[in-house]
Structures are given as C-alpha cells and as structure tokens.
Amino acid sequence: MTTLFDILNTLNNNNNNNNNYAGCKRQHSINKRVDIIPSMDVTLTNDKLIIETELTGVSKNDIDINIKDSILIIQGEKKKSIIKHQQQQQHQQQQQQQQQQQQQQQQQQQQQQQQQQQQQQQLENSNKENDEPSIEEFEEDVKSKSELNKTTLNTTENKDEDKTTQNISKKFISERSFGNFKRYLNLSEILYQLDLNSINTQFENGLLTITIKKKFDSSNTIKININ
C-alpha cells in the first residue's frame, strides 16, 4: 500500500528526471534561453495538492501555467520593466529639456538675425546717403557679431553638458538575475486523485500558489459492468 511519503518521493524523482529531460528538449523547441530556475515547494495533504513557486520581481501578466500530458508547466519571464521604465522617463525628460533649449536658442538666433537684417538695411540706406558708415553703426555691427559668437559658444557648451549628464549613471553592483524561467512537475503518479476542475491560483508578494483539490473517490480502479 502506497503512502503519502511514497507518492511525494516519486513526485520529486520524476520531477528531477523530467527537468533534466526538459532541459535538453527546450533547446530544440524553444528559442528563448532559460536563465532562472525558481524555487518550488510541493505539499500533498489529505484533501489537496499545494504547489508554491517563488517568482519575486515577476509580473502576473508574464506568467504562463498549463498542464500537458500529466505535466504541470510554469513558465514566464522576469523583465527589467521597472528599470527600463525609469530610464525611459529620464530619457524623455532629457529629450524634452534639450528640445526646449534648442527652441529657445533658435528663437534667440532668429531675433538676432532679424536685428542684423534691420541693421544692415539701415547701414545700406545710410551708405547710400553717405559713402562712409558712421562710428555708431560700426560699433553696433561689431556688437551684434560678438553676440552671435557668444550664442554659438553657449550652444556648443550646452550640448557638451548634455552629453556628460547622460552618461553619469553607473552600476556598481549587479547581482539580480533577469530572463526566462521554466519549471516542470510530473503529476502522472497522482493525477487520478486530483480534480483538475478545482484548480485555484494565487499570486501575492512574489509567491505563486497553485492549489488542486483531491477527488472524493480517488481510487484508480474503474468498475466495468458486463452487459
């Protein structure tokens, strides 16, 4: 007569063998590389089977659970979504600031160009009247050119500052693991005892809990009547 201890032992052995087999198989069937092997606890009580899997940092939308050929498969991906989102926000803010600075610089340049054009027209008009330009006009022309040179220098300095600020962030310690994961659990030894219609899943604080209730009549013998 088999006991709960025997069933759990066979579950554990079959699970290890199946994981080894699946590891070879998934290289051919799945292009994605498996980077993480999450920890799993399996508990068999008098009325249910409880499977607990640690999936810290994984989103609920990135977890896929199914049963195929008496094998429970838990797979998914642990993404760098939070870090990427923060980096994207920072990048967008930097781009917006750069665009605002460029727009301001363009407006300043347009205003200065308009002032130059007006000054040139005034100079041309004055030159028509007098062949030699006045001292005041000459000084204004020199001032406008010097202001233009200053603005171009400021724009190049701002661009250099933007490049330096973008490359400030550095990662000193990187110990977290990200990527795809996949776990197999062979249920062939106790599948006849389980009511698959009663499967309940719960995901809270990074712990995935799958509960499968047992059938009321869990005997593996089927009575066949003779007609």
UniProtKB/Swiss-Prot annotation:
Residue numbers spanned by region Disordered: 119-164
Keywords associated with the record: Stress response
InterPro entries per the UniProt record, alphabetical: A-crystallin/Hsp20_dom, HSP20-like_chaperone, HspG1-11-like
Pfam families from the UniProt entry: HSP20
Location of the sHSP domain: 31-227
Domain of life assignment: Eukaryota
Matches recorded under PANTHER family: HEAT SHOCK PROTEIN DDB_G0288861-RELATED
UniProt family annotation: Belongs to the small heat shock protein (HSP20) family.
Protein name according to UniProt: Small heat shock protein hspG3
Taxonomic lineage: Eukaryota, Amoebozoa, Evosea, Eumycetozoa, Dictyostelia
